[in-house]
């Protein structure tokens, strides 16, 4: 488990299925994710089983209230970890909308990036954001990511083609 000031990142468990179905079937939550709705219970259960079997560094994001009760608010992870080349792709979804815009994404990704560089010994973490998602783009910039490219009209979502902004962060840039 990774602990920050307001968030904790813990491994995914089978009983997270209910939250995953809720989050990833919510059009507002997934509007900048390229996913195919609806997500079924079977498909999400299979994904959880495969992810845990591969021991991928994918976590549920939790926050605790003043009484210490934990609430799951989203998920994050490092995907396609390549130990040979020292790189991975980062992703995050804050599924509980009442927690949007309060800095939970920044704190979560700070923990995840530290984990990637200091525990997994990565050299580089990559990420992408679809251009309409201004909040995600600002978050990447605040974390020190550098825009490395743009894939024009990379995905089709909600009746329009979206450009994908590609970001990268090297370990030595993170240490600064």
Residue ranges and their predicted role:
Residues 48-62:
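A short helix-loop-beta-strand connector motif used in the catalytic cores of GNAT acetyltransferases and
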Residues 1-12, 16-17, 58, 65-176:
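Acyl-donor (CoA/ACP) binding surface of acyl/acetyltransferases
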Residues 23, 47-48, 100, 174:
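Tryptophan-centered motif/residue detector
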Residues 20-21, 29, 44, 90:
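Hydrophobic pocket/interface hotspot
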Residues 28-49:
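Conserved GNAT-fold acetyl-CoA-binding loop/helix
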Residues 22, 46, 138, 142:
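DNA-binding alpha-helical recognition surfaces that contact promoter or target DNA
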């Amino acid at each position: 488990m990774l602990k920050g000031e307001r968030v904790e990142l813990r491994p995914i468990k089978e009983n997270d299925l209910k939250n995953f179905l809720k989050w990833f079937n919510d059009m507002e939550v997934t509007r900048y994710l390229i996913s195919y709705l609806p997500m079924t219970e079977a498909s999400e259960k299979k994904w959880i089983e495969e992810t845990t079997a591969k021991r991928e560094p994918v976590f549920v994001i939790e926050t605790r209230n003043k009484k210490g009760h934990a609430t799951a608010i989203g998920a994050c992870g490092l995907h396609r970890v390549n130990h040979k080349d020292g790189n991975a792709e980062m992703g995050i979804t804050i599924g509980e909308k009442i927690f949007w815009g309060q800095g939970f994404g920044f704190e979560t990704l700070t923990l995840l990036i530290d984990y990637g560089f200091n525990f997994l010994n990565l050299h580089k973490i990559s990420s992408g954001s679809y251009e309409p998602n201004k909040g995600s783009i600002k978050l990447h910039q605040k974390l020190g990511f550098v825009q490395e490219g743009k894939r024009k009209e990379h995905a089709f979502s909600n009746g329009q083609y979206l450009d994908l902004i590609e970001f990268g962060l090297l370990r030595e840039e993170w240490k600064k």
